[in-house]
Amino acid sequence: MSIAPPPLSVLLELTHRCPLACPYCSNPIALAALREEMDTAGWRSLLQQAADMGVLQAHFSGGEPMLRKDLPELVAHARALGLYSNLITSGVAGGEPMLDQLQAAGLEHVQLSVQDVDAAGADRIAGYRNSLSKKREFAAAVRARGLPLTINAVLHRHNAERVPGMIALALEWQAERIEVAHTQYDGWGLRNRAALMPSREQLLATIDAVETARRQLGDRLAIDFVTPDYYARQPKPCMGGWGQRFVNISPRGDVLPCHAAETIDGLRFDNLRERSLADIWNNGEAFVRFRGTAWMPEVCQGCPKREIDWGGCRCQALALSGDAATLDPVCERSPIHAQVRATAEQESASPAPAFIYRRPERPAAATADPLE
């Protein structure tokens, strides 16, 4: 039996149910049904086990976590255990009564997704009418209760030029932080890659917009920025390193090293109904397989950054090369690095295909705009 340092944070994907249908959603293509979701007792046990291990943060996510009526109870339990609680939400479900309950339960932070600053563009991405106005109302309710607010803005070819507007929106809504993140191509994002991929010119413009805003705003607004991997020369560390800082719990209670890990065939993902969190974290096949550096191919073993990027993303390696155990193909040392860049350039230069919206039914078929 091995003992690994405990994760810093646990992400509780309480449900895959969501009012929105964003085509870049990181949830898996095979969404969990309501009947498959872990019950309240299961989530409470998970929080207790996490606290016992030394985990510091509990992030309540989904889907849309505010669709779970037991969310206030779970937040209160996290608070009682000394876990920092963060809500990751679309802001269009639950409303002020639920927010009051969450505040009373001890919720400490809210992350609110924003699809676009253009109302029509926001509705088109979300597949949900009047989404921006509802998010504005929710943000105002969050700030009226004195809760810290972070705006999560996901970028792609259809909204990349509106980064300055997104930053202005964060200021208007009195957010303390904004995360401006290009789409990461896993889950539904991978399925919609050709519809979402920005051009290199768009990427450079977003970099310039963020750097300009940082200079102008100083400490008035914290701005986090995540670039798209496909134009990179070096990979990003997956969740701070596979099985090192982060653990993800699916609605079914499966324990995952990252939210996309289930795409890797051949790995066994243990469930909390059958095994303890600590045992899974320390000894579970899925966590041990790519933890550390022993698994790395020779080209990674000799790299001075091997304990910085940890070989990059295993799910992306599988998606682009067919082998989860090879180096991330966005790395310039990869034999298919140029092919990855060429794919991005070709897709971004081609007409964008229709979105495949995130829906539990008929996930493999291209769908019409749900707003039409």
Curated annotation (Swiss-Prot):
It comes from Xanthomonas euvesicatoria pv. vesicatoria (strain 85-10) (Xanthomonas campestris pv. vesicatoria). Catalyzes the cross-linking of a glutamate residue and a tyrosine residue in the PqqA protein as part of the biosynthesis of pyrroloquinoline quinone (PQQ). Pathway: Cofactor biosynthesis; pyrroloquinoline quinone biosynthesis. The keyword Oxidoreductase applies. Keywords: 4Fe-4S, Iron, Iron-sulfur, Metal-binding, Oxidoreductase, PQQ biosynthesis, S-adenosyl-L-methionine. It catalyses: [PQQ precursor protein] + S-adenosyl-L-methionine = E-Y cross-linked-[PQQ precursor protein] + 5'-deoxyadenosine + L-methionine + H(+). [4Fe-4S] cluster binds at residues 18, 22, 25. The gene is pqqE. Binds 1 [4Fe-4S] cluster. The cluster is coordinated with 3 cysteines and an exchangeable S-adenosyl-L-methionine. Residues 342-372 are annotated as: Disordered. It is an enzyme of class 1 (oxidoreductase). The keyword S-adenosyl-L-methionine applies. It comes from the Bacteria. Belongs to the radical SAM superfamily. PqqE family. Residues 4-220 form the Radical SAM core domain. GO terms for molecular function: 4 iron, 4 sulfur cluster binding; cyclase activity; iron ion binding; oxidoreductase activity; S-adenosyl-L-methionine binding. Interacts with PqqD. The interaction is necessary for activity of PqqE. Its cofactor is [4Fe-4S] cluster. One of its GO terms (biological process) is pyrroloquinoline quinone biosynthetic process. This is PqqA peptide cyclase. SUPFAM superfamilies: Radical SAM enzymes. Its EC number is 1.21.98.4.
